[in-house]
Amino acid sequence: VVLLDNYSLLTEVVANPTAYGFSNATGVACTVSSSLFCSANTLVTPDAANTYVFADGVHPTTAAQKLSAQYALSVLKAPAQVGVVGAAAMTAGQRYAQRLMSYAPNVSDQAWHAFADAGYSKTDFGKAADSKNKYLLVGADRRISAGNVHAGLTLGYDRASGDLGAAAGEFNLKETSVGAYVGKKADQGAIMGYVRYGRLSADIDRNIALGAANRTESGSSKGAHYTIGVQGNLVLGTFANGKVKHGPVGGFAYEKMRLDGYDEAGNTSTSMSFGAQKREGMVASLGYQLRGEFGKVKPYASLSYEVDGTDADNIKARLKSAPTSFSTEAPKSDNGVRLKLGAQIDLAKNVNLVVGAERTFGKDSGQQTVFNLGVDARF
């Protein structure tokens, strides 16, 4: 059962009718005693059904009923709309693993290795909901044993902005993260394990159309994001006189994310309270890659199938004026294919420029485009 507050809504409309597209909130549209017997022939003016708030002493006009329907629909859609923020938060953990492996080939027998990577990504969740993300990731590692085994730490900052849906509102999401990783590189391939922890902060603006008026309800939430996983690749062979290596590439990770529940700041008929958002589960990928070495330029390409096994709890919500809540499903990401293209370019001895682009295919929700640019050094 979803409880609405039509009384407060109509009270707000009566207090400022012109804002909602009405010209009369004190009189009635019908010349007969009850709207049950009212018709186009018994209106006080031909357009009274669209300009008056009340048809008789109790019942709303056609336009006021349409406004009430907009109100009800906005309440029903609200939990799934704010759920886009939780879905957007999950993309940072998956991107982290991709970026670490972009720099793994440059680890050598030098004692230290450091990198900095910046990028942009856009994720589409369907129904005009999306997330546009800018990020910066820096890391440093040290060789801890013979055989190119390195261990390191990372610091990251992600900032996302996006739409909750078509004209449904916007959000801003920030995540500050720390991570640790250990990896080994050999002629036959590389493997890396990692952990990551991020603190989340979100500002959410939800738009509601009510007749001629557009209202915005705002709120804020904080949370946490955990990731642990492993990535690796193997070299099965070469061609082009040994200049191009090829072999499988894959990864496996567990992610958990929570955004705290929050109350919107307003105290109107449309102001709502939302429960916590929780997502967790496994993400896996398996594919094949090519990696070339042509002098100072080392291009790479890979094609992988990704399985997103994360589950999201239903999101609870209620009007702030209502005693009980209801829940709806949160947006989910789909399985799909990821294509990666890029290159490493030698800028100087032990210094490399890394450029890359990624695109997923076959996803109704979670379709993603990524661009990154970075530099790393060994010393």
Set out the residue ranges of the language-model regions.
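Sec-exported extracytoplasmic/periplasmic mature domains
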Residues: 12-19, 69-78, 233
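Primarily extracellular Gram-negative trimeric autotransporter adhesin
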Residues: 74-108, 309-322, 326
